[in-house]
A protein has these predicted regions:
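Alpha-helical segment proximal to the catalytic Tyr-Lys
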Residues: 60, 103-107, 167
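Substrate-binding pocket helix/loop in short-chain dehydrogenase/reductase
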Residues: 2, 30-32, 36-41, 138
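C-terminal substrate-recognition "lid" of short-chain dehydrogenase/reductases
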Residues: 13, 61, 147-167
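Active-site loop-to-helix junction immediately N-terminal to the catalytic Tyr of the SDR YXXXK motif
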Residues: 35, 80-88, 100
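Active-site helix of classical SDR
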Residues: 55, 90, 98
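Catalytic Tyr-x(3-8)-Lys segment
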Residues: 132-152
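Residue(s) in the substrate-gating loop at a strand-loop-helix junction
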Residues: 74
């Protein structure tokens, strides 16, 4: 359970300075009308609910350390990408949850941020293969002309957001 994981991390390391919520499962590539409740639940439970539960359980530790939360969301909800209804719904929920947490937890010194990386991941590779025209259109709208590199681009942003420089 989430409570046990967070408690174990706090006991093992003596504190929790940073919480990064990045896990997400979904049935990308499935149109809205073809989604089942199980498909939708997969995205909501693995993304939005997981983020909520980890944030809730980690808050006492983060409050004590004046730590940081970095939640991963996506442009999928912002831009309405085909075949990503449940994924987009979960990620938009995470963005809203994060905004509320930033307002509520900021006075306690806890920094809450959202990263919407559009990084080249296995899930995005699948989407690229299933929607090549949409992929090409998306690339044209990115100033660098490419998706982010998970380590070089996204990882460095997370390191900064977890640092005192971002507070």
């Amino acid at each position: 359970q989430v409570e046990d994981v967070v408690k174990k991390a706090g006991e093992t390391f003596g504190r929790i300075d940073v919480l990064i919520n990045n896990a997400q499962a979904s049935k990308s590539g499935v149109s809205l009308v073809d989604h089942t409740k199980e498909d939708f639940d997969l995205a909501i439970y693995s993304g939005l609910y997981a983020t909520f539960f980890y944030m809730r359980e980690a808050f006492p530790y983060l409050k004590e350390s004046r730590g940081s939360v970095i939640n991963f969301a996506s442009g999928a909800g912002l831009f309405g990408k085909l075949g990503q209804s449940s994924y987009a719904a979960a990620k938009e929920g995470i963005r809203g949850l994060s905004r509320v947490a930033a307002a509520e937890w900021g006075p306690f010194g806890v920094n809450v941020n959202v990263v919407c990386p559009l990084a080249m991941t296995p899930g995005l590779e699948k989407w690229k293969d299933e929607y090549p025209k949409l992929y090409a259109q998306t690339i044209q709208g990115i100033p660098l002309g490419r998706f982010a590199d998970p380590e070089k681009d996204v990882g460095r942003v997370c390191v900064f957001l977890a640092s005192e420089d971002a507070a």
